[in-house]
Amino acid sequence: MLEKIIGKSGVEEFRKFWNKKLSLEDFKKIISFGILLALGMILFNCYLKYVTFNGELKGEKILYVKIDGSTGAVQKVNNKYLGKQASIKNTKNLSYGYYLMRFDVKKVVTKKEFTTIEGKIKGYKESKLNNFRRYILNIFDDLFMTEENLYAFSRAAVLGEKSEVSKDMKDKFKYTGLAHLIVISGTHISLVVIGIVKILDTVNLAYKWKYIFSLIALTLYCTLVGMSPGILRAYIMGAMMILARILFQQEDSKKSLMISLIVILVLNPYAITDISMQLSYAAVIAIIFVYPHIERILNIKFLEKMENGILKDSLKLTILSLCIQIVSIPLFLYYFEKLPLFSFLLNIIGVPIGTVLIETLFSITLLNILKLKFLNFIFVPVAQAIYNAFEGFIFMGSKIPMLQLNVAGKIDLWIVFVYYILLIVGIIFVRNVGFEIEDEIKKRSIKKY
Protein backbone atom coordinates (compact mmCIF):
# COMPACT_ATOMS: atom_id res chain seq x y z
CA MET A 1 0.00 0.00 0.00
CA LEU A 2 2.77 2.43 1.00
CA GLU A 3 4.65 1.59 -2.20
CA LYS A 4 1.63 2.57 -4.32
CA ILE A 5 1.45 5.98 -2.62
CA ILE A 6 5.11 7.03 -2.57
CA GLY A 7 6.69 4.54 -4.98
CA LYS A 8 9.65 2.19 -4.54
CA SER A 9 12.09 5.04 -4.02
CA GLY A 10 9.90 6.40 -1.24
CA VAL A 11 9.74 3.04 0.53
CA GLU A 12 13.51 2.65 0.21
CA GLU A 13 14.02 6.16 1.61
CA PHE A 14 11.73 5.29 4.54
CA ARG A 15 13.83 2.18 5.30
CA LYS A 16 17.04 4.23 5.16
CA PHE A 17 15.53 6.87 7.42
CA TRP A 18 14.24 4.28 9.92
CA ASN A 19 17.45 2.23 10.02
CA LYS A 20 19.85 5.18 10.03
CA LYS A 21 22.41 5.03 12.86
CA LEU A 22 23.47 8.16 14.68
CA SER A 23 27.07 9.17 14.06
CA LEU A 24 29.24 10.86 16.69
CA GLU A 25 28.70 14.16 14.87
CA ASP A 26 24.91 13.70 14.95
CA PHE A 27 25.09 12.89 18.66
CA LYS A 28 27.13 16.08 19.32
CA LYS A 29 24.54 18.15 17.45
CA ILE A 30 21.71 16.65 19.51
CA ILE A 31 23.58 17.34 22.78
CA SER A 32 24.35 20.93 21.68
CA PHE A 33 20.73 21.52 20.76
CA GLY A 34 19.60 20.10 24.11
CA ILE A 35 21.98 22.39 26.03
CA LEU A 36 20.87 25.47 24.06
CA LEU A 37 17.23 24.54 24.60
CA ALA A 38 17.77 24.12 28.36
CA LEU A 39 19.62 27.47 28.60
CA GLY A 40 16.89 29.15 26.59
CA MET A 41 14.21 27.79 28.92
CA ILE A 42 16.13 28.98 32.01
CA LEU A 43 16.57 32.50 30.57
CA PHE A 44 12.93 32.59 29.47
CA ASN A 45 11.80 31.58 32.97
CA CYS A 46 13.95 34.33 34.56
CA TYR A 47 12.57 36.92 32.14
CA LEU A 48 9.04 35.66 32.83
CA LYS A 49 9.45 36.33 36.55
CA TYR A 50 10.74 39.85 35.81
CA VAL A 51 7.73 40.92 33.68
CA THR A 52 5.02 39.15 35.71
CA PHE A 53 2.78 40.88 38.25
CA ASN A 54 3.41 39.02 41.51
CA GLY A 55 1.57 41.31 43.92
CA GLU A 56 -1.85 40.86 45.47
CA LEU A 57 -4.82 41.80 43.28
CA LYS A 58 -6.43 44.03 45.86
CA GLY A 59 -6.97 47.75 46.24
CA GLU A 60 -6.29 50.39 43.60
CA LYS A 61 -4.34 49.22 40.54
CA ILE A 62 -3.48 50.66 37.13
CA LEU A 63 -4.95 48.40 34.46
CA TYR A 64 -4.34 48.40 30.71
CA VAL A 65 -7.54 47.05 29.20
CA LYS A 66 -8.97 46.24 25.78
CA ILE A 67 -12.72 46.94 25.88
CA ASP A 68 -14.89 44.90 23.52
CA GLY A 69 -18.60 45.02 24.28
CA SER A 70 -19.71 44.37 27.86
CA THR A 71 -16.29 43.20 29.06
CA GLY A 72 -12.66 44.24 28.88
CA ALA A 73 -9.61 41.98 28.58
CA VAL A 74 -6.95 42.97 31.10
CA GLN A 75 -3.62 43.28 29.27
CA LYS A 76 -1.45 44.53 32.17
CA VAL A 77 -1.61 45.31 35.90
CA ASN A 78 0.73 48.09 37.09
CA ASN A 79 2.61 47.69 33.79
CA LYS A 80 3.23 43.99 34.49
CA TYR A 81 1.66 40.95 32.84
CA LEU A 82 -0.73 38.65 34.69
CA GLY A 83 0.08 34.95 34.66
CA LYS A 84 -3.46 34.22 33.47
CA GLN A 85 -6.12 35.82 31.29
CA ALA A 86 -8.49 38.08 33.19
CA SER A 87 -11.35 40.44 32.41
CA ILE A 88 -13.39 43.24 33.97
CA LYS A 89 -16.99 44.31 33.40
CA ASN A 90 -17.50 47.38 31.22
CA THR A 91 -19.56 49.24 33.84
CA LYS A 92 -18.91 52.64 32.19
CA ASN A 93 -20.25 51.46 28.80
CA LEU A 94 -16.96 52.43 27.17
CA SER A 95 -16.70 52.01 23.41
CA TYR A 96 -14.41 49.50 21.70
CA GLY A 97 -10.73 50.28 22.16
CA TYR A 98 -7.78 50.39 24.54
CA TYR A 99 -7.83 52.15 27.93
CA LEU A 100 -5.45 52.88 30.79
CA MET A 101 -7.55 52.99 33.96
CA ARG A 102 -7.41 53.32 37.72
CA PHE A 103 -9.33 50.37 39.07
CA ASP A 104 -10.29 49.63 42.67
CA VAL A 105 -10.10 45.83 42.94
CA LYS A 106 -12.70 44.40 45.35
CA LYS A 107 -12.65 40.71 44.50
CA VAL A 108 -11.14 38.21 42.05
CA VAL A 109 -13.47 35.42 40.88
CA THR A 110 -12.15 32.39 38.98
CA LYS A 111 -14.53 29.91 37.33
CA LYS A 112 -12.87 27.08 35.40
CA GLU A 113 -10.28 28.93 33.27
CA PHE A 114 -11.98 32.34 33.34
CA THR A 115 -10.90 35.02 35.83
CA THR A 116 -13.00 38.13 36.49
CA ILE A 117 -11.63 41.10 38.42
CA GLU A 118 -14.53 42.76 40.21
CA GLY A 119 -14.37 46.34 41.40
CA LYS A 120 -14.88 49.95 40.33
CA ILE A 121 -13.42 52.03 37.50
CA LYS A 122 -12.23 55.21 39.25
CA GLY A 123 -10.77 56.91 36.19
CA TYR A 124 -9.53 56.17 32.70
CA LYS A 125 -7.55 57.53 29.79
CA GLU A 126 -8.31 56.18 26.35
CA SER A 127 -5.99 55.54 23.43
CA LYS A 128 -5.83 58.40 20.93
CA LEU A 129 -6.67 55.89 18.20
CA ASN A 130 -10.04 55.12 19.80
CA ASN A 131 -11.58 58.16 18.07
CA PHE A 132 -10.53 56.82 14.68
CA ARG A 133 -11.84 53.35 15.61
CA ARG A 134 -15.19 54.93 16.49
CA TYR A 135 -15.16 56.85 13.20
CA ILE A 136 -14.82 53.60 11.23
CA LEU A 137 -17.44 51.85 13.38
CA ASN A 138 -19.81 54.75 12.63
CA ILE A 139 -19.31 54.07 8.91
CA PHE A 140 -20.63 50.54 9.44
CA ASP A 141 -23.43 51.92 11.65
CA ASP A 142 -24.59 54.16 8.79
CA LEU A 143 -24.29 51.54 6.04
CA PHE A 144 -25.14 48.16 7.57
CA MET A 145 -27.14 48.76 10.78
CA THR A 146 -30.25 47.12 9.27
CA GLU A 147 -28.22 44.14 8.01
CA GLU A 148 -27.63 42.49 11.39
CA ASN A 149 -25.16 39.74 10.43
CA LEU A 150 -23.32 41.77 7.77
CA TYR A 151 -23.04 44.59 10.33
CA ALA A 152 -21.44 42.22 12.86
CA PHE A 153 -19.17 40.63 10.24
CA SER A 154 -17.92 43.99 8.90
CA ARG A 155 -16.97 45.21 12.39
CA ALA A 156 -15.18 41.93 13.18
CA ALA A 157 -13.44 41.50 9.81
CA VAL A 158 -12.15 45.07 9.46
CA LEU A 159 -11.51 46.16 13.07
CA GLY A 160 -11.56 42.92 15.07
CA GLU A 161 -14.54 44.19 17.12
CA LYS A 162 -16.57 41.04 17.86
CA SER A 163 -19.12 42.20 20.44
CA GLU A 164 -21.92 42.18 17.82
CA VAL A 165 -21.11 38.66 16.58
CA SER A 166 -23.74 36.31 18.01
CA LYS A 167 -22.88 32.95 19.58
CA ASP A 168 -24.83 31.18 16.82
CA MET A 169 -22.80 33.00 14.16
CA LYS A 170 -19.50 32.16 15.91
CA ASP A 171 -20.48 28.49 16.25
CA LYS A 172 -21.33 28.22 12.54
CA PHE A 173 -18.01 29.78 11.52
CA LYS A 174 -16.11 27.47 13.87
CA TYR A 175 -17.93 24.33 12.73
CA THR A 176 -17.33 25.07 9.05
CA GLY A 177 -13.63 25.82 9.63
CA LEU A 178 -13.96 29.46 8.53
CA ALA A 179 -13.56 31.17 11.91
CA HIS A 180 -10.25 32.71 10.78
CA LEU A 181 -12.24 35.05 8.51
CA ILE A 182 -13.90 36.87 11.44
CA VAL A 183 -10.62 37.58 13.24
CA ILE A 184 -7.79 39.78 12.00
CA SER A 185 -5.26 37.38 10.50
CA GLY A 186 -2.55 37.04 7.88
CA THR A 187 -5.28 37.16 5.21
CA HIS A 188 -6.24 40.68 6.27
CA ILE A 189 -2.60 41.81 6.42
CA SER A 190 -2.00 40.49 2.89
CA LEU A 191 -5.11 42.26 1.60
CA VAL A 192 -3.98 45.57 3.13
CA VAL A 193 -0.52 45.32 1.52
CA ILE A 194 -1.83 44.16 -1.87
CA GLY A 195 -4.57 46.81 -1.84
CA ILE A 196 -2.18 49.69 -1.06
CA VAL A 197 0.31 48.49 -3.70
CA LYS A 198 -2.45 48.30 -6.34
CA ILE A 199 -3.71 51.78 -5.47
CA LEU A 200 -0.19 53.23 -5.65
CA ASP A 201 0.36 51.46 -8.99
CA THR A 202 -2.32 53.73 -10.47
CA VAL A 203 -0.31 56.87 -9.62
CA ASN A 204 2.90 55.47 -11.12
CA LEU A 205 4.89 55.80 -7.89
CA ALA A 206 8.51 54.65 -7.72
CA TYR A 207 9.02 51.01 -6.69
CA LYS A 208 10.66 51.72 -3.30
CA TRP A 209 8.22 54.44 -2.30
CA LYS A 210 5.32 52.19 -3.16
CA TYR A 211 6.44 49.65 -0.57
CA ILE A 212 7.49 52.30 1.97
CA PHE A 213 3.94 53.69 1.93
CA SER A 214 2.60 50.12 2.13
CA LEU A 215 4.68 49.55 5.28
CA ILE A 216 3.38 52.79 6.81
CA ALA A 217 -0.22 51.83 5.99
CA LEU A 218 0.28 48.33 7.40
CA THR A 219 1.76 49.74 10.63
CA LEU A 220 -1.14 52.18 11.06
CA TYR A 221 -3.72 49.47 10.41
CA CYS A 222 -2.21 46.94 12.83
CA THR A 223 -1.83 49.63 15.51
CA LEU A 224 -5.46 50.60 14.94
CA VAL A 225 -6.85 47.08 15.40
CA GLY A 226 -4.45 46.33 18.28
CA MET A 227 -1.21 44.38 18.33
CA SER A 228 -2.54 41.11 19.72
CA PRO A 229 -0.07 38.18 19.44
CA GLY A 230 -1.71 36.83 16.26
CA ILE A 231 -1.81 40.26 14.60
CA LEU A 232 1.74 41.06 15.70
CA ARG A 233 2.95 37.80 14.12
CA ALA A 234 1.26 38.68 10.82
CA TYR A 235 2.53 42.28 11.02
CA ILE A 236 6.19 41.33 11.62
CA MET A 237 6.17 38.78 8.79
CA GLY A 238 4.41 41.23 6.47
CA ALA A 239 6.78 44.06 7.41
CA MET A 240 9.84 41.85 6.80
CA MET A 241 8.47 40.87 3.39
CA ILE A 242 8.00 44.54 2.48
CA LEU A 243 11.48 45.48 3.78
CA ALA A 244 13.00 42.67 1.70
CA ARG A 245 11.43 44.19 -1.41
CA ILE A 246 12.52 47.71 -0.48
CA LEU A 247 16.11 46.52 0.02
CA PHE A 248 15.96 44.15 -2.99
CA GLN A 249 16.67 41.16 -0.76
CA GLN A 250 15.39 37.59 -1.01
CA GLU A 251 12.29 37.02 1.12
CA ASP A 252 12.80 34.36 3.82
CA SER A 253 9.51 33.31 5.39
CA LYS A 254 11.20 30.85 7.79
CA LYS A 255 13.49 33.53 9.17
CA SER A 256 10.55 35.96 9.41
CA LEU A 257 8.55 33.39 11.38
CA MET A 258 11.35 32.83 13.90
CA ILE A 259 12.03 36.57 14.32
CA SER A 260 8.32 37.26 14.85
CA LEU A 261 8.17 34.59 17.58
CA ILE A 262 11.24 35.99 19.38
CA VAL A 263 9.92 39.58 19.22
CA ILE A 264 6.48 38.57 20.50
CA LEU A 265 7.90 36.56 23.41
CA VAL A 266 10.22 39.42 24.39
CA LEU A 267 7.32 41.90 24.34
CA ASN A 268 4.90 39.53 26.07
CA PRO A 269 6.14 36.11 27.27
CA TYR A 270 2.58 35.07 28.14
CA ALA A 271 1.59 35.38 24.49
CA ILE A 272 2.78 31.78 24.14
CA THR A 273 -0.35 30.71 26.06
CA ASP A 274 -2.66 32.70 23.76
CA ILE A 275 -4.89 30.28 21.80
CA SER A 276 -5.22 32.56 18.77
CA MET A 277 -1.43 32.91 18.58
CA GLN A 278 -0.93 29.14 18.78
CA LEU A 279 -3.48 28.56 16.00
CA SER A 280 -1.91 31.37 13.95
CA TYR A 281 1.57 29.85 14.20
CA ALA A 282 0.22 26.35 13.56
CA ALA A 283 -1.32 27.58 10.29
CA VAL A 284 1.86 29.37 9.18
CA ILE A 285 4.05 26.38 10.12
CA ALA A 286 1.79 24.19 7.97
CA ILE A 287 2.09 26.64 5.05
CA ILE A 288 5.89 27.03 5.30
CA PHE A 289 7.15 23.65 6.54
CA VAL A 290 4.52 21.03 5.62
CA TYR A 291 2.67 22.02 2.45
CA PRO A 292 5.72 22.63 0.17
CA HIS A 293 7.01 19.07 0.71
CA ILE A 294 3.56 17.52 0.14
CA GLU A 295 3.08 19.68 -2.95
CA ARG A 296 6.51 18.66 -4.32
CA ILE A 297 5.62 14.95 -4.23
CA LEU A 298 2.08 15.47 -5.57
CA ASN A 299 3.43 17.76 -8.27
CA ILE A 300 5.81 15.04 -9.47
CA LYS A 301 3.08 12.39 -9.31
CA PHE A 302 0.21 14.17 -11.06
CA LEU A 303 -0.18 17.94 -10.41
CA GLU A 304 2.34 19.01 -13.08
CA LYS A 305 0.35 16.98 -15.63
CA MET A 306 -2.79 19.04 -14.92
CA GLU A 307 -3.54 22.22 -16.84
CA ASN A 308 -3.43 25.48 -14.89
CA GLY A 309 -6.92 26.58 -13.95
CA ILE A 310 -9.67 26.50 -11.33
CA LEU A 311 -9.49 22.71 -10.84
CA LYS A 312 -5.75 22.71 -10.15
CA ASP A 313 -5.96 25.78 -7.88
CA SER A 314 -8.89 24.25 -5.97
CA LEU A 315 -6.96 21.02 -5.47
CA LYS A 316 -3.93 22.94 -4.16
CA LEU A 317 -6.14 24.95 -1.79
CA THR A 318 -7.71 21.71 -0.53
CA ILE A 319 -4.28 20.17 0.13
CA LEU A 320 -3.12 23.36 1.87
CA SER A 321 -6.26 23.44 4.05
CA LEU A 322 -5.74 19.78 4.95
CA CYS A 323 -2.11 20.47 5.94
CA ILE A 324 -3.24 23.34 8.20
CA GLN A 325 -5.90 21.12 9.76
CA ILE A 326 -3.42 18.29 10.41
CA VAL A 327 -1.05 20.66 12.22
CA SER A 328 -3.91 22.26 14.20
CA ILE A 329 -5.73 19.07 15.31
CA PRO A 330 -4.04 18.74 18.76
CA LEU A 331 -4.90 22.36 19.60
CA PHE A 332 -8.57 21.82 18.75
CA LEU A 333 -8.64 18.64 20.84
CA TYR A 334 -6.88 20.27 23.79
CA TYR A 335 -8.65 23.65 23.92
CA PHE A 336 -12.05 23.06 22.29
CA GLU A 337 -12.54 19.28 22.75
CA LYS A 338 -13.34 18.99 19.04
CA LEU A 339 -11.84 16.83 16.30
CA PRO A 340 -11.92 18.49 12.84
CA LEU A 341 -12.59 15.93 10.11
CA PHE A 342 -13.89 17.37 6.84
CA SER A 343 -14.25 21.08 7.63
CA PHE A 344 -11.14 21.79 5.53
CA LEU A 345 -13.14 20.93 2.39
CA LEU A 346 -15.38 23.98 2.83
CA ASN A 347 -12.32 26.24 2.48
CA ILE A 348 -12.35 25.54 -1.28
CA ILE A 349 -15.41 27.78 -1.67
CA GLY A 350 -15.59 29.61 1.65
CA VAL A 351 -12.12 31.19 1.60
CA PRO A 352 -12.39 32.76 -1.91
CA ILE A 353 -15.88 34.15 -1.20
CA GLY A 354 -14.87 35.39 2.24
CA THR A 355 -11.70 37.00 0.88
CA VAL A 356 -13.62 38.88 -1.84
CA LEU A 357 -16.12 40.03 0.80
CA ILE A 358 -13.35 41.34 3.08
CA GLU A 359 -11.71 43.10 0.10
CA THR A 360 -15.05 44.79 -0.65
CA LEU A 361 -15.49 45.89 2.98
CA PHE A 362 -11.95 47.32 3.04
CA SER A 363 -12.74 49.21 -0.19
CA ILE A 364 -15.96 50.64 1.30
CA THR A 365 -14.09 51.70 4.45
CA LEU A 366 -11.34 53.45 2.47
CA LEU A 367 -13.82 55.20 0.14
CA ASN A 368 -15.76 56.59 3.10
CA ILE A 369 -12.58 57.73 4.87
CA LEU A 370 -11.63 59.57 1.65
CA LYS A 371 -15.16 61.09 1.57
CA LEU A 372 -16.04 59.30 -1.69
CA LYS A 373 -19.45 58.30 -0.31
CA PHE A 374 -21.17 58.71 -3.67
CA LEU A 375 -19.65 55.32 -4.61
CA ASN A 376 -21.51 53.57 -1.79
CA PHE A 377 -24.49 52.93 -4.07
CA ILE A 378 -22.23 50.59 -6.09
CA PHE A 379 -20.12 48.89 -3.41
CA VAL A 380 -22.70 48.47 -0.62
CA PRO A 381 -25.16 46.36 -2.70
CA VAL A 382 -22.19 44.30 -3.93
CA ALA A 383 -21.10 43.67 -0.33
CA GLN A 384 -24.66 42.73 0.63
CA ALA A 385 -24.96 40.30 -2.30
CA ILE A 386 -21.60 38.65 -1.56
CA TYR A 387 -22.40 38.38 2.15
CA ASN A 388 -25.80 36.80 1.45
CA ALA A 389 -24.09 34.17 -0.71
CA PHE A 390 -21.39 33.69 1.93
CA GLU A 391 -23.92 33.40 4.77
CA GLY A 392 -26.00 30.94 2.74
CA PHE A 393 -22.92 28.81 2.11
CA ILE A 394 -22.02 28.80 5.83
CA PHE A 395 -25.63 27.96 6.79
CA MET A 396 -25.68 24.98 4.40
CA GLY A 397 -22.22 23.93 5.54
CA SER A 398 -23.31 23.99 9.18
CA LYS A 399 -25.94 21.35 8.34
CA ILE A 400 -23.38 18.89 6.95
CA PRO A 401 -22.61 16.17 9.51
CA MET A 402 -19.10 15.00 10.47
CA LEU A 403 -17.27 18.25 9.69
CA GLN A 404 -16.20 18.20 13.34
CA LEU A 405 -16.73 15.72 16.16
CA ASN A 406 -17.17 16.55 19.82
CA VAL A 407 -14.70 14.72 22.05
CA ALA A 408 -15.52 13.73 25.62
CA GLY A 409 -12.97 15.56 27.73
CA LYS A 410 -9.74 17.42 27.07
CA ILE A 411 -6.78 15.34 25.86
CA ASP A 412 -3.64 15.19 28.02
CA LEU A 413 -0.83 17.60 27.23
CA TRP A 414 1.67 14.77 26.70
CA ILE A 415 -0.45 13.53 23.78
CA VAL A 416 -0.08 16.95 22.14
CA PHE A 417 3.72 16.77 22.48
CA VAL A 418 3.88 13.19 21.15
CA TYR A 419 1.68 14.18 18.18
CA TYR A 420 3.98 17.05 17.22
CA ILE A 421 7.13 14.94 17.64
CA LEU A 422 5.65 12.34 15.27
CA LEU A 423 4.58 15.13 12.92
CA ILE A 424 8.15 16.51 12.81
CA VAL A 425 9.48 13.02 12.03
CA GLY A 426 6.83 12.69 9.31
CA ILE A 427 7.76 16.05 7.76
CA ILE A 428 11.46 15.07 7.66
CA PHE A 429 10.54 11.76 6.03
CA VAL A 430 8.26 13.37 3.41
CA ARG A 431 10.95 15.97 2.65
CA ASN A 432 13.57 13.26 2.12
CA VAL A 433 11.19 11.26 -0.07
CA GLY A 434 10.57 14.33 -2.23
CA PHE A 435 14.30 14.99 -2.68
CA GLU A 436 14.92 11.30 -3.43
CA ILE A 437 12.21 11.21 -6.12
CA GLU A 438 13.57 14.41 -7.70
CA ASP A 439 17.11 12.97 -7.75
CA GLU A 440 15.85 9.77 -9.36
CA ILE A 441 14.02 11.72 -12.07
CA LYS A 442 17.16 13.78 -12.76
CA LYS A 443 19.26 10.62 -13.08
CA ARG A 444 16.75 9.12 -15.54
CA SER A 445 16.72 12.28 -17.65
CA ILE A 446 20.56 12.32 -17.74
CA LYS A 447 20.62 8.66 -18.88
CA LYS A 448 18.22 9.47 -21.74
CA TYR A 449 20.71 11.98 -23.10
Regions from the PLM with identified roles:
Residues M1-E56, E113-I117:
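N-terminal leader/targeting segments
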Residues V11-K28, N204, E307-L311, Q404-K410:
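Short, Lys/Arg-rich N-terminal segment immediately upstream of the first membrane anchor
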Residues F53-G72, M101:
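Structural detector for short beta-strands of small beta-barrel domains
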Residues Q75-V77, V108-K128:
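OB-fold/S1-family single-stranded nucleic acid-binding modules
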Residues N78-L94:
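Beta-strand/loop nucleic-acid-binding surfaces
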Residues K92-L94, D104-T110:
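Short, charged beta-turn/beta-strand-edge "cap" motif at the junction between a beta-strand
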Residues I121-M237, I242:
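Aromatic-rich juxtamembrane segments at the membrane interface
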Residues M227-Y420, I427-I441:
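Internal transmembrane alpha-helical bundles of multi-pass membrane proteins
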